């Protein structure tokens, strides 16, 4: 079975084809980052228009180069969470294409796709596991019991980790999108030159809050002369604080469940320091294993949508006639469509 995956939840247009026998066949991605960089952030209306402009181009390219259109058995598309306008572009296109080809169409959850994306490369990855989902809009600790059965153990009460990274980067004068730039700058910083607070690490819950850390960082920036080294020192202190919080909370979740498998997914999972420290923690403290995707699968992509579609096909009701978008669709409330 071959599954066409369509991803348009935010500002990346992703198209991929996954074969259950052969694995990932095609993975095309169009990024809008250069467009939104001019505005310092994502403009939803522009994102929707660019999806509309690029989605046909990408699919036409795939079908002409690979001559594979008649071999598609299922179309999976991101139904949520995400920007309503962007989701609607992908959903409408998927349903229209499914109707024209007379094949089933399946709406899938974007965060579940991120959660399971390491399975594209790690066939040994099994349930149950603890997952740390970290992106621009989500910071969650999830207990994954089995396919479709997830419990949110901890959630961001305000800014997500990725959002905090972007806002602090902007304070330091880095260009959008700036998460990677901040990490590169932090690598040049002097460890413990500044000490930033670790919010909520002593709280009984596994929830996160990064708005206070963001405000603290803003005050440090205002009170210091910002030469390049001082910027690096601030970036280092901020990154260390965020990663400390993420791993302290994750460690508590692992102890709580008694599990030895950890998945880190979402855009922030590309962070080099987070990867290294989580690997060290799992090997040395839990004698377990951490799974994270290759960098190309950390950010939004069609491959994870196609793969999830292949897993979900047998369990979900498939209908290409109903266009479904759920901008606030939580991973613990799938009640699968």
From Swiss-Prot:
Gene3D superfamilies: 3.30.420.40. InterPro entries: ATPase_NBD, Gcp-like_dom, KAE1/TsaD, Peptidase_M22_CS, TsaD. Fe cation binds at residues 110, 114, 300. Keywords: Acyltransferase, Cytoplasm, Iron, Metal-binding, Transferase, tRNA processing. It catalyses: L-threonylcarbamoyladenylate + adenosine(37) in tRNA = N(6)-L-threonylcarbamoyladenosine(37) in tRNA + AMP + H(+). GO terms for cellular component: cytoplasm. Its cofactor is Fe(2+). It comes from the Bacteria. One of its GO terms (molecular function) is N(6)-L-threonylcarbamoyladenine synthase activity. Binds 1 Fe(2+) ion per subunit. Its EC number is 2.3.1.234. Belongs to the KAE1 / TsaD family. This is tRNA N6-adenosine threonylcarbamoyltransferase. The lineage of its organism: Bacteria, Pseudomonadati, Pseudomonadota, Gammaproteobacteria, Enterobacterales.
